[in-house]
A protein has these predicted regions:
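Basic, low-complexity segments
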Residues: 1-14
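Short, surface-exposed, charge-dense and proline/glycine-enriched linear segments
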Residues: 2-5, 33, 50, 71-77
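Acidic-residue sensor for enzyme active/binding pockets
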Residues: 8, 28, 40, 69-70
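Amphipathic, hydrophobic secondary-structure cores in small proteins
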Residues: 15, 19-20, 24-61
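Short, charged, surface-exposed hinge/linker loops at domain edges
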Residues: 53-77
Length: 77
């Protein structure tokens, strides 16, 4: 199963935000919680429908999204 098999974007689910397929758990929530210090074990306990593979897919999805994003930096004068 690939990242894209686990991540779903549907305008009728969470206003079209990327979620773990078959859930209403946004990718953003997973990444935000991890950024706040939650580890995989804590996420799996808090969201029993998640699997370790779902968490890894969410992280890869964000990395892929950022990898294809253009960043424009302004030069300080």
């Amino acid at each position: 199963m690939t990242v894209h098999d686990r991540i779903e974007i549907n305008s009728k689910v969470m206003l079209g935000k990327p979620v773990i397929r078959g859930t209403r758990i946004p990718v953003e929530l997973i990444v935000r919680k991890m950024g706040e210090g939650a580890d995989e074990k804590a996420l799996l306990q808090a969201y029993p429908t998640l699997t370790p593979q779902d968490i890894h897919a969410a992280l890869r999805y964000v990395a892929d999204s950022l990898g294809h994003e253009e960043v424009v930096l302004s030069v300080a004068e």
